[in-house]
UniProtKB/Swiss-Prot annotation:
Residues 147-157 have a biased composition (Basic residues). It comes from Homo sapiens (Human). It comes from the Eukaryota. The keyword Coiled coil applies. This is Coiled-coil domain-containing protein 201. Residues 111-131 form a coiled coil. Residues 1-79, 92-159 are annotated as: Disordered. Keywords: Coiled coil.
Length: 187
């Protein structure tokens, strides 16, 4: 052993013991979800590892025990109903067809009035979008101040005067050079 290094009393058999071994986190493949609901819930069609299944049931055994422990009509707080888009559309259509017992069935006049209201709302939303886009064609959150900025007429006149003075200076230099017959030689 080297001087200055202390022996902690660990043998090679102790180094390999599972209690002292540092475990690296297992790398998982990212889950692929077929619906946005499944992605939000972190649900995957194949459960990881040690889930035991009831015979013939696609649900793990601990889910069926949870469902059996709750009274009928009350769902456990952890379970979430998943509905497919096609069933949502079908339920909306059927709810439009059926009316409440105390209500009158919808007439064609009331339906056309509802359609007109929806169209007006859509037109208002589109016009608002068009106005907001025309007002700020740049990046969102950054004001477009270039069109609004007006230059002070006095400052503008002063800048134009400076430009005119510079042009006069350059023309005078050119005139002097031609009077003295100075030429620019290329090297």
């Amino acid at each position: 052993m080297e001087p200055g290094v202390q022996d902690l009393g660990l043998s090679s058999s102790e180094d390999e013991s599972p209690s002292l071994a540092i475990r690296s986190p297992t790398l998982r493949k990212p889950l692929k979800h077929s619906t946005p609901e499944e992605a939000a819930l972190g649900w995957s069609p194949r459960p990881s590892g040690g889930a035991s299944y009831l015979s013939g049931s696609p649900m793990p055994a601990h889910f069926s025990q949870d469902l059996a422990s709750h009274p009928a009509g009350v769902s456990p707080p952890a379970t979430v109903r998943k509905r497919r888009l096609s069933t949502l559309w079908a339920s909306k259509e059927s709810s439009l067809d059926l009316s409440a017992p105390g209500e009158e069935p919808p007439t064609s006049a009331s339906l056309t009035q509802r359609q007109r209201q929806r169209q007006q709302q859509q037109q208002q939303q589109e016009s608002l979008r068009a106005k907001s886009w025309a007002q700020n064609p740049g990046l969102p959150g950054i004001l477009n101040t270039t069109g609004r900025k007006r230059r002070d007429p006095k400052k503008r006149a002063a800048a134009m005067e400076r430009v005119r003075q510079w042009e006069i200076y350059v023309l005078q230099n050119i005139e002097e050079a031609t009077q003295h017959e100075l030429t620019i030689e290329d090297d």
